[in-house]
């Protein structure tokens, strides 16, 4: 009897091991530049959710802790573990070439996401793709949103000069999103015939605490009573600005962000933020996962999906969000 039980246990263990080994056949290595980035945290959780819906796929997740050398080491380990594809959120976009050479050495496809590699890097490897957004579009849509509200709220023009006096919280200098959003939000306002005057601009590195400190300094400076609009390259910094404005009893000054994080949508609902721009984390995650899974299985990158690939890139569109359409995004 005991021998039969042992034999049955061995068979069950073998079956379980076989199932595990089968799942491991479609291993995908994923790196996130840092887990505690507000937006990338949403993307990461969405990728993990997509992974759970595909039982034949095993995701090997890594926090690169904002350290490119650490990410390079993680990629070496993932390749040594035999992953069939890589999904890489670069710490430094300039490191794409290094990552590609590692992947090429093992003939492993790589899907970059959120931080865009150079055209040269993408073109250097036939199995390299990118999922992200059009950085310019986010700035244009944010500009449209500000213009809409500026024209509807004459009281925002504190000195009645017909010109927006603004401060701008910029993301990481050199980051394509930070540079494009900073340039195109102002350009779009000017293209719409709205004059602008920059009172202050500084980087807060996408970070809420740094943005609060920058905003606090501006609200304690000589231009404190001239600020009419606060523009932030992302919601995390917009939330820091909201905290500083509240501390200075200036919550009536409108704040605009980008990302449509749940916390920011709550602030739009309460009126603490005037608007944001949906940076579609769920669809960026889904496209990244779908492409990586297809490539890991030896299929065409977009096979069986609705994603449109142009020049090896999937662009996920942005959408402006304010109180007028907020309900469309808070019911998800």
Swiss-Prot record:
Protein residues bound to Ca(2+): 157, 159, 161, 163, 165, 228
InterPro entries documented for this protein: Bact_Solute-Bind_Prot2, MglB-like_PBP1, Peripla_BP_I, SBP_2_dom
| GO biological process terms held by the UniProt record | chemotaxis
Which residues does the record give as beta-D-glucose binding sites?
37, 114, 175, 177, 181, 234, 259, 279
Protease listed as a keyword: no
Q: Name one GO cellular component term.
A: outer membrane-bounded periplasmic space
Site (described: Interacts with membrane-bound trg signal transducer): 97
Q: Which PANTHER family does the annotation name?
A: D-GALACTOSE_METHYL-GALACTOSIDE BINDING PERIPLASMIC PROTEIN MGLB (PTHR30036:SF2), D-XYLOSE-BINDING PERIPLASMIC PROTEIN (PTHR30036)
Cite the record's note on assembly.
The ABC transporter complex is composed of one ATP-binding protein (MglA), two transmembrane proteins (MglC) and a solute-binding protein (MglB).
Q: What is known of its domains?
A: The calcium-binding site is structurally similar to that of EF-hand proteins, but is in two parts, with the last calcium ligand provided by Glu-228.
Protein name (database record): D-galactose/methyl-galactoside binding periplasmic protein MglB
Q: Which organism is it from?
A: Salmonella typhimurium (strain LT2 / SGSC1412 / ATCC 700720)
